[in-house]
Structures are given as structure tokens and as C-alpha cells.
């Protein structure tokens, strides 16, 4: 296919155009008075959302080069989402501000590599400053505040997440599912999560989120490799008759068997997913036995004289719901409390008896997984459109609270970054020179961008607000919900330090990449050839036939 090649300024300008378009559509959602964005869906009702990364994923431009700019800045949002689960809009706005200022300097003759070096050093300095200023989270109230802000200032959601964390512990699993009523409810049930995702992405049932969700599935647990699909046939046939989904957790599934499962899944013959068993050696077996207890099934192992080809449907475990993504599997079970408690007691006894610290640690891990349970938040809403929006907000809120527990909190509302700008300028003037200093100053100017945007979305003058905040103490900032200057920590307007840090690092990384771009190679759009006119029957046959 023919390519189009663009160099220098023209290349960077084309990228900038795409970045502008994406940032504008995402930035309108920033802050407590941010607006919503409506996404058209090919099938079903349009989606009304307020989530930066979801909007970014939807944007595709006609112009290939501008689309490359969109993809670059989308990466800043996705990487922040992967690392911290929230703060995607802030990362996008920051990256945009850095790119704009950087391109002006490159156009004026500055060396892009030196600018990038300055930007990178500024990012390292700021990360250390954010860590310095982060306050650890100690009480439930702070957790509720972080959750409420991430869910779009919804105090009820914040409180619910704080309750969930209290019940299942800071490391516990909080799962989301669609409720049957108008209200959002919380329940704690038996369950566990382990760090293995699906073996093949073709098992995903929700391709937008790349997740496999199995409702009331059967679970086949085995500690051996599944090599031949013939071994599985009796079980698969029995399950196909019940019409229920199946999850296979095995040491491994080899190519032939995996291909057969995928084909059956894609053809709709059987809703099946497969996951590798977690752990190694004896620990793997013990964890599989834990899962067997949790799901009221049997571990099919040759030690017990059981073979997969002879497995009956009664030997399989069951669960209420299983969610699998590329990295983790969450099992929500119910109705097995007695067996789970007995198993936990058994693990505690083993912990008392063992001398090895390593074994104790691993047993403690297993106990936490089994005893902690899963907090299930059932999302309630009046319409499906509202349900989807609520689910995205809740997901952000859960991720943000976990990030806050990990690395602490900082003043929110763009305040932290704005307050760090003078410190960065001072440090850069002392430690950097020439074009590296210009690079660091680009970052210092960009740090005001999220605060300005939050203020503008609330109808205030962004530049005036940023200037006012700069002269106030570190924890004071602009409360866009009430249009006044307050102590952000006292008012509960807080951000997880991890979210602020990830957003900044990813924005600086993308900005550096865009500034050092000197050439773009993209596909030339294919010219659609005009169809020949099929006039009359002249010259024999009509022009509409393909001979």
C-alpha cells in the first residue's frame, strides 16, 4: 500500500491538530462542573459518559495523520488508567499543554532532544515532590472522600466504597455488577481473586472492556495440562445440554484443545473460558483445592484417582459470577460458608505448625484470599444509559481509593500541580541551563492547565484562579463546586498521589515523544474508483453484470 511521508514542522503540526481535537472533547468533563459527552453506538442506545479514557478510545478521525496524534495522546490516558485507574482527563490536559508549549519552542528553533531532556528531569523532580507532600490515608472518612470525588462528587458512592473496604480489608476485592433495582447496594459474599487472566483474548464476552463475564457458570478444576480435546468432550457435551457457561482452570491448555474451545465459544455452541491455575508446584495444588472448597466442586487430580475424561457434572464447582480480564480472575461464590470457614481453620493450623517464615507468608496470602471474601456493589439505575455511566464512575472511584491507600493523598482539584510550579521553576533555574531549562519551564507552565480547565468548566476565569492559588499555602485551592478558595484537605477535595504522579509521568513521556518527532509515515487513503455507468445494453450485455 502506498504511504504518505511528511517531515519537520508539517508533521508536528498535523499531530498537534489531532491532539487538540481529542483534548477538547475530553477536557469538557474535567472537574465537579464538567459536562457529559454522548457517544453514538452502532447498536443500542447512545452512551452518555463522563470518563476521559472511554471518550478517548472512541475518537477516530478521517485524516490518518491527525489520527496518529489522537492515538499518541490516547496512550497517555490509557497508561494512566492502567497504572492508577483514574486521572485520565488530567493526564490528557497536561500532555496537551506540554505539547503546545513545546511545539512553539521547536518552531522557534529550539533543539527538541534538549527540550525532552529538560521535560524528563522536571518530571523526576515533580514525582519526588508529590511523594514528599503525600499524606497517608488513615481513616474511613478520607477513603469516602476520595471515592466521592472520583465518582463525580457522589457522597453516597464514596461512603459505600469506604464500607466495602472496611469489610473486605484494604487489599480486598470489590466487584461491580448490574443490580436489579433503582438503588445501588453493597453486599459481602464469599469469593476470591487471583492473578491469572484468560489464556486467549477470544474468550472475552465484552469486547469493549476485554472482559469475560460468566453468570452462574460451572467450574472445572484440574492440576494437569489439557493436551487433547477428546479428554474434555464428555464434560463439554454434558454442559452444552445445561446451557450454562463453563470456566476451566488448569495447569495449561495446549494449542489443539485451546483452538477447539475458542471455535466453540465463537460459534456460540458453548460459552466457555479457560484460565491457567495460579502458583507453582504444591502451592498451585493447594490454591486449586481452596477454589474447590469455595465453589463446592472437586479438584480433578490423578493423586485422587480422578481423570478429566471421566469427570461428571457433579464434580464441577459452581459460582454466582466470574469476571476475567487479561490479568486477573474474580470468583464470586455463595452459600458455602461452612466449608470455607472449615478450610480457613485448617490453613490457620498449618500456619501455627510451620517454622518457615516463607511458608507462613504464603499461607497467610491464601487465608486472606479465602477469608476476605468479595464485596459486590450492585449498581442501580433507572435506565441502561444511566447504569453504564454509573458503572464507569464507580469503577474510577474504586480504583482511586485503592491508589490512595497505596501511596497516600494530596490536595485535589489541580491544586497540587499548580503549587509545585514555583518550586520546579526555582529548582530548574539552579540545576539546569540552556534548552534543558526551557524544557523544564514548559512543564512548569503546563502544571496550571488542569486547574485552569476545572475553573473554566465552572464558569470562572482560569488564569485568574491559577494566579490566586499560586500565592496561597500548599493545601489551599479553588473549590469549583462552590466557586471559592478553601483548604482542600479540610474540605475533602483530595486526589490519590498515585493518580497525580501517573498522570504527570505519562503526560511528560508523550510530550517528549511528540516534540522529538521529525517524520510521519502513514497510509495514503485509497481512492475509491467510480463504478462504470451501466447504461443500456449497448455493445452486447449491460454494464451491471460481472463476467
UniProtKB/Swiss-Prot annotation:
Residues where ATP binds: 29-32, 86-90, 413, 479-481, 495
Location relative to the cell: Cytoplasm
Keyword Nucleotide-binding: yes
Biological process, per Gene Ontology: protein refolding
GO cellular component, one term: cytoplasm
InterPro entries attached to this UniProt entry: Chaperonin_Cpn60_CS (IPR018370), Cpn60/GroEL (IPR001844), Cpn60/GroEL/TCP-1 (IPR002423), GroEL-like_apical_dom_sf (IPR027409), GROEL-like_equatorial_sf (IPR027413), TCP-1-like_intermed_sf (IPR027410)
PANTHER family reported for this sequence: 60 KDA HEAT SHOCK PROTEIN, MITOCHONDRIAL (PTHR45633)
Family, as annotated: Belongs to the chaperonin (HSP60) family.
Protein name: Chaperonin GroEL
Amino acid at each position: 500500500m502506498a504511504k504518505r511521508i511528511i517531515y519537520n514542522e508539517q508533521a508536528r503540526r498535523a499531530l498537534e491538530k489531532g491532539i487538540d481535537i481529542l483534548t477538547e472533547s475530553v477536557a469538557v468533563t474535567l472537574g465537579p462542573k464538567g459536562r457529559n459527552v454522548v457517544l453514538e453506538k452502532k447498536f443500542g442506545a447512545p452512551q452518555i459518559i463522563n470518563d476521559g479514557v472511554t471518550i478517548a478510545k472512541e475518537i477516530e478521525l478521517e485524516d490518518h495523520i491527525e489520527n496518529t496524534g489522537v492515538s499518541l495522546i490516547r496512550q497517555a490516558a490509557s497508561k494512566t488508567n492502567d497504572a492508577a485507574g483514574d486521572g485520565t482527563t488530567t493526564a490528557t490536559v497536561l500532555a496537551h499543554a506540554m505539547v503546545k508549549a513545546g511545539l512553539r519552542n521547536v518552531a522557534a528553533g529550539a533543539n527538541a532532544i534538549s527540550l525532552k531532556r529538560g521535560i524528563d528531569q522536571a518530571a523526576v523532580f515533580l514525582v519526588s515532590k508529590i511523594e514528599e507532600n503525600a499524606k497517608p490515608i488513615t481513616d474511613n472518612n478520607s477513603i469516602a472522600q476520595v471515592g466521592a470525588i472520583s465518582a463525580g462528587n457522589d457522597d453516597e458512592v464514596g461512603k459505600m466504597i469506604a464500607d466495602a473496604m472496611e469489610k473486605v480489608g484494604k487489599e480486598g476485592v470489590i466487584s461491580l455488577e448490574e443490580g436489579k433495582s433503582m438503588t445501588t447496594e453493597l453486599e459481602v459474599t464469599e469469593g476470591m481473586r487471583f492473578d491469572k487472566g484468560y489464556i486467549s483474548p477470544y474468550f472475552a464476552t465484552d469486547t469493549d472492556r476485554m472482559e469475560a463475564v460468566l453468570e452462574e457458570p460451572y467450574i472445572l478444576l484440574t492440576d494437569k495440562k489439557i493436551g487433547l480435546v477428546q479428554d474434555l468432550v464428555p464434560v463439554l457435551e454434558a454442559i452444552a445440554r445445561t446451557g450454562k457457561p463453563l470456566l476451566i482452570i488448569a495447569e495449561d491448555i495446549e494449542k489443539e484443545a485451546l483452538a477447539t474451545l475458542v471455535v466453540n465459544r465463537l460459534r456460540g455452541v458453548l460459552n466457555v473460558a479457560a484460565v491457567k491455575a495460579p502458583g507453582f508446584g504444591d502451592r498451585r495444588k493447594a490454591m486449586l483445592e481452596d477454589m474447590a472448597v469455595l465453589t463446592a466442586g472437586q479438584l480433578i487430580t490423578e493423586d485422587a484417582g480422578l481423570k478429566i475424561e471421566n469427570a461428571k457434572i457433579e464434580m464441577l464447582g459452581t459460582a454466582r459470577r466470574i469476571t476475567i480480564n487479561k490479568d486477573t480472575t474474580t470468583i464470586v461464590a455463595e452459600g458455602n460458608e461452612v466449608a470455607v470457614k472449615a478450610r480457613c481453620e485448617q490453613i490457620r493450623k498449618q500456619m501455627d505448625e510451620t517454622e518457615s517464615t516463607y511458608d507462613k507468608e504464603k499461607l497467610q496470602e491464601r487465608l486472606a484470599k479465602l477469608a476476605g471474601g468479595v464485596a459486590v456493589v450492585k449498581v442501580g439505575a433507572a435506565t441502561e444509559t444511566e447504569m453504564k455511566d454509573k458503572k464507569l464512575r464507580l469503577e474510577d472511584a474504586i480504583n482511586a481509593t485503592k491508589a490512595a491507600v497505596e501511596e497516600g493523598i494530596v490536595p485535589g482539584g489541580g491544586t497540587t500541580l499548580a503549587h509545585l510550579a514555583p518550586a520546579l521553576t526555582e529548582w530548574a533555574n539552579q540545576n539546569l541551563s540552556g534548552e534543558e531549562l526551557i524544557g523544564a519551564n514548559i512543564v512548569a507552565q503546563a502544571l496550571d492547565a488542569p486547574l485552569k480547565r476545572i475553573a473554566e468548566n465552572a464558569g470562572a476565569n482560569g488564569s485568574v484562579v491559577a494566579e490566586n492559588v499560586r500565592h496561597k499555602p500548599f493545601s489551599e485551592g479553588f473549590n469549583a463546586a462552590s466557586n471559592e478558595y478553601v483548604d482542600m484537605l479540610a474540605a475533602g477535595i483530595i486526589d490519590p498521589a498515585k493518580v497525580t504522579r501517573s498522570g504527570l509521568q505519562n503526560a511528560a513521556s508523550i510530550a517528549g515523544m511528540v516534540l522529538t518527532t521529525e517524520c510521519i509515515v502513514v497510509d495514503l487513503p485509497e481512492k475509491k474508483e467510480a463504478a462504470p455507468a451501466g447504461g443500456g445494453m449497448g455493445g452486447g450485455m449491460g454494464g451491471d453484470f460481472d463476467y
